[in-house]
């Protein structure tokens, strides 16, 4: 039906007759001449109809925004005075000769330009219209190019693209599963996979050596901002590898993606132990573009009478930390109150601070409600250890270590952006040496997942599980976890030891993971892998603010689709066929 895409026409096509199809982006009537801006996937071109082409002119007079048309005409150069440098096709226009209206369109529910003020709710309800907007469309063109580069790279590294099941069995991987009732096995359920983890490990047992997949994953998580119940991973696994092998392959892959799509040469990927990341930045995914750091000062405050500080300072599970903000004296009382409210989200009971108005003036040059509770030596020690200078502000966190890390870690990022303290565009790193487990109310939980190989022997793991480190590694970029992976357990005995540390009995392990344990008995090779969040990678690289901007048909923050009204009730006949009865909520 067409010879060219609208957005592909250039001065080199001058004089050619072309056939175009697309949507009418705008119609203008200028003194008896009608101009149509015709849009397709590749861009926009101006088409001119004059009264000499009687039939086509009459139809052009009828068309309105978003009508679908087909036309033919001759490409010609625009007069220099009316050329549009803001359009890729701005040097030329098409003199229309024939026009066919393929479909009419109602008035769109919102403007389809980049400056549309439409809210997200209406945009998601009419998502197919929202996707017509050029600034939205370009995100998906970028995403398509990214997956193409990834596939080409991994194929070149000897990885095979293998699809794993979508209907599988429920296995505890951290979040709740989406369950699918089986009609042919009444009372039994499939689960949608949270990841291809166990299947890709079994592909290594099968001898596939190198596997990858652009995999759809599902997690029925509690509602959180910018999380999606279904998301896409770049998933890979390889046999006969150690950490350096997987990290090397994936680092080269990410470098290749950035080079080909953004013409960016990423800086070095430093390695940082988990413990150092938490100590310095309060986060296991620190944004290294922000120079602010958390500095331990518990030893300086353990003896003060101020229990807010001395309590956590003397608590083995507590932490007292300071964060120096260069130029922070400019923050107003209102600003500080706002930050105090912000850290309360993370459980902090308050936010102490000291303003260093004049370092040379000693105590007279400091401003803070807490100065009266601190000794002269403590104040001097804090100023020296933080490297405070005139004009700086020091924030403090004192509580359980988890609360201090989360509160000051989040505050560090917020203050860094608010005060324009972000330096550089890209700051990647590897976080390594993660704890094997985290403890909650006396129960151990896998920090990553229970199939991660520990760095120690089975005997050492049994004797001191709380101190065990794992052979896990996370790739972090600008404070976002791009991907996480590990060397996996390939020994049935070690796998049972880890299950035991997690409180999973032999019976439960056999019932839930028997197929994996069986597979490990038949010559499982050493293997490891990593999974990247494709959606987040695209979001970061395109500069989008929300992950929903890079998913074609995303769910809302309440895990619903306003376009299709999913999830929705189903009729009783369908429920009976799968043996499900819906319990009505009481009250």
Curated annotation (Swiss-Prot):
Q: Which family does it belong to?
A: Belongs to the class-II aminoacyl-tRNA synthetase family. Type 1 subfamily.
| Entry EC no(s) | 6.1.1.23
Question: Could you cite one Gene Ontology molecular function of this protein?
Answer: aspartate-tRNA(Asn) ligase activity
Instruction: From the Swiss-Prot or TrEMBL record, state where the protein is found.
Output: Cytoplasm
What's the stated role of this polypeptide?
Aspartyl-tRNA synthetase with relaxed tRNA specificity since it is able to aspartylate not only its cognate tRNA(Asp) but also tRNA(Asn). Reaction proceeds in two steps: L-aspartate is first activated by ATP to form Asp-AMP and then transferred to the acceptor end of tRNA(Asp/Asn).
Tell me which residues bind L-aspartate: 173, 219, 448, 488
Q: Where is this region: Aspartate?
A: 197-200
The cross-references to PROSITE patterns, in alphabetical order and at most eight, read: AA_TRNA_LIGASE_II
**Catalysed conversion reaction:** tRNA(Asx) + L-aspartate + ATP = L-aspartyl-tRNA(Asx) + AMP + diphosphate
Q: What is this protein called?
A: Aspartate--tRNA(Asp/Asn) ligase
Q: Which PANTHER family match?
A: ASPARTATE--TRNA LIGASE, MITOCHONDRIAL, ASPARTYL/LYSYL-TRNA SYNTHETASE
Subunit-structure text:
Homodimer.
Q: Report the gene name.
A: aspS
Record NCBIfam families: aspS_bact, PRK00476.1
Q: Which organism is it from?
A: Alcanivorax borkumensis (strain ATCC 700651 / DSM 11573 / NCIMB 13689 / SK2)
- InterPro entries from the entry? Aa-tRNA-synt_II (IPR004364), aa-tRNA-synth_II (IPR006195), aa-tRNA-synth_II/BPL/LPL (IPR045864), Asp-tRNA-ligase_1 (IPR004524), Asp-tRNA-ligase_1_N (IPR047089), Asp/Asn-tRNA-synth_IIb (IPR002312), AspRS_core (IPR047090), GAD-like_sf (IPR004115)
Q: Which residues bind ATP?
A: 219-221, 228, 481, 533-536
Q: Which Gene Ontology cellular-component terms appear in the entry?
A: cytoplasm
Which residues are marked as site: Important for tRNA non-discrimination? Answer: 30
Q: Name one Pfam family in it.
A: tRNA-synt_2
- Give one GO biological process term: aspartyl-tRNA aminoacylation
Print the keywords alphabetically.
Aminoacyl-tRNA synthetase, ATP-binding, Cytoplasm, Ligase, Nucleotide-binding, Protein biosynthesis
